[in-house]
């Protein structure tokens, strides 16, 4: 079902959503930028909604509320895949713009990570502060073979602080260790306050003087979207961390 639904969503290679007459497949409508009519509903979508109506007509009324809740969840699930397609396309658009002088950096925080033990009590668990992990995936293009290279930089703090200073410190280390160093960068992140804030924007204004790197643009995406690769990296890091903890417990 997911594959068939996503196939009917259309977006240009430049990341521009395309109008569709079926409102369920119109990306422009999904993001509130469509002023055209949606005169029809496709057969698959109509069958889906008719299916829920059919069930409601053949079950007790006390189950109707649960069915409505399931339908809302299904619509939310469809919305998630709509956003994912749209935002992942924008990631690809920026990667396609790369040349040998630039870099695309995708950054993200892992939510608070709690130290774990195989034999800890509940009071021990809730008393912990945990630590924060910040990852930067740096994409550059090899001028010799025109292929993308990826470097990963992980930084963690022994508290749960996720703010502009931790972000700036992490990126400082990235620029100091990148080899070769790019002439310009595009940053992609969620729109959390640790990125989307005045303090960090003021710091970015000094990047040219400090690192000889031009910040071409900073793209803010929805939290949790379009970061599949960095999410996979976080999963591997946490899995390795948990295995080490268990081994030494």
Model-derived segments and spans:
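Extended mixed-charge, aromatic/glycine-enriched low-complexity segments
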Residues: 1-249
